[in-house]
């Protein structure tokens, strides 16, 4: 989908505040509410906008630690990769999982309450997934940057 300067401005406004009113978005991008609404609906239909979420503080809900886990599998068969991905999808604490190139097969981001909670998750969930050869974990000490898509570097369609 080709996005013009108005589409990109709408996306930026929604990234900044997905709860902004159509009037506020229109004022920010230089359009009235109806054209904004039509553009938003088109971007939703075409999959540019995948949904709207709330940015919830993990700490406010007791998830005090984030763990980054690197996993190497025994096999790289389609069946093994599929089964590992399916098993990860069933673990609620897994926030993100990436199949990657390099020394490891997967990088996983996990939210846990504390080290005991992580140890429990390892024993009861992660290490019960068949096919894991090796894993390496690191606790995040501090998050240095969390950001959204860099819309400022996207060139608008003419």
Regions found by a protein language model. Give the residues of each.
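A compositional/biophysical signature of low hydrophobicity enriched in polar/charged and small residues
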Residues: 1-158
């Amino acid at each position: 989908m080709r996005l013009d300067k108005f589409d990109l401005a709408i996306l930026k406004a929604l990234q900044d505040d997905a709860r902004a009113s159509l009037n506020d978005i229109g004022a920010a991008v230089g359009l009235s509410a109806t054209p904004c609404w039509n553009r938003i609906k088109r971007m939703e239909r075409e999959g540019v906008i995948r949904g709207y979420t709330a940015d919830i503080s993990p700490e406010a809900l007791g998830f005090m630690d984030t763990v980054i886990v690197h996993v190497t599998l025994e096999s790289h068969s389609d069946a093994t990769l599929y089964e590992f991905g399916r098993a990860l999808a069933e673990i609620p604490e897994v926030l993100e999982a990436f199949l990657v190139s390099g020394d490891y097969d997967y990088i996983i981001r996990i939210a846990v309450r504390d080290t005991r909670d992580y140890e429990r998750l390892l024993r009861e969930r992660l290490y019960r997934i068949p096919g894991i050869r090796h894993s390496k974990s690191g606790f995040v000490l501090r998050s240095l940057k969390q950001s959204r898509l860099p819309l400022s570097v996207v060139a608008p369609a003419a």
